[in-house]
Structures are given as structure tokens and as C-alpha cells.
């Protein structure tokens, strides 16, 4: 068994869609990034790659490569899932947290979980997504950005 941990953060800006867990969430701002800036999926991918000792998302999807400009992170997650399969890893579970003052994430979490399960071709009960605020503290608490953390367990 192998444990992996992932973290990602992006700044909130105007004129961008807010996409988390592959879900477009209605909000006046979105996350700034080279791809769709889906911090949840990016943290999950980093935890999976880390557990398998396969590097991180920057190795496979560099922000200097124009082909990843505006990339759909669900497609990137599918690639990571295929890479794990090729290396004989099975996902035991994923537990992820979104840290954001606003908007409320609870209504969107079931769809996020479904998207992740489908992209990785695993059962829904292997994925947990939760959200919290930082009670107005720090950059996420003041609404400047959103971050996400993920931990996973892989079996070979």
C-alpha cells in the first residue's frame, strides 16, 4: 500500500469560469491558470502520482506547453488513471478537501464525486470530497483564491 498527498491553489479572477471537480459552478469569479485551473482535480492527480512515485502534474502537463492551455482537467485525470493502471496500481480510496470561503460547495459535491469516479473508472464509494472555509482568514478566507488538498491510498 502506498499513500500520496496533493495540494493545489489558484487565484480567483473575473472573466473565468469556476470549475471544480469537473463541475462548472455559478460564481462571479473563476480560477486563474494555464488549464481550467481545477484545484480539486489537480490536488487529486498530484496525490495519485505521488503515491505511485510517478512525479507530479507538472511533469506530464507543463504550464509551458501550449497544448494544455485551457485543458479540461477531467481529461488529464483520465490520463493519470490510465498511467496508474499501466503501472499496476489500484486506487483504494481518495479523500479530498476544497478550501473556499465562497461559493458553497455542498450542492456540487455529489456531481464532483461522480465525475472523478467516471474519469478514474472506479466505484463512487472510493471517493470522498468535502469542503471547508477558513473562517475569513488567509487568502482563501478573504476570497482571493481557492485551494484543495487530497490524500489517496494505492494498492499494487
UniProtKB/Swiss-Prot annotation:
Involved in the biosynthesis of isopentenyl diphosphate (IPP) and dimethylallyl diphosphate (DMAPP), two major building blocks of isoprenoid compounds. Catalyzes the conversion of 4-diphosphocytidyl-2-C-methyl-D-erythritol 2-phosphate (CDP-ME2P) to 2-C-methyl-D-erythritol 2,4-cyclodiphosphate (ME-CPP) with a corresponding release of cytidine 5-monophosphate (CMP). 4-CDP-2-C-methyl-D-erythritol 2-phosphate binds at residues 8-10, 34-35, 56-58, 61-65, 100-106, 132-135, 139. Binds 1 divalent metal cation per subunit. Its cofactor is a divalent metal cation. It comes from Clostridium perfringens (strain SM101 / Type A). This is 2-C-methyl-D-erythritol 2,4-cyclodiphosphate synthase. SUPFAM superfamilies: IpsF-like (SSF69765). One of its GO terms (molecular function) is metal ion binding. Keywords: Isoprene biosynthesis, Lyase, Metal-binding. It catalyses: 4-CDP-2-C-methyl-D-erythritol 2-phosphate = 2-C-methyl-D-erythritol 2,4-cyclic diphosphate + CMP.
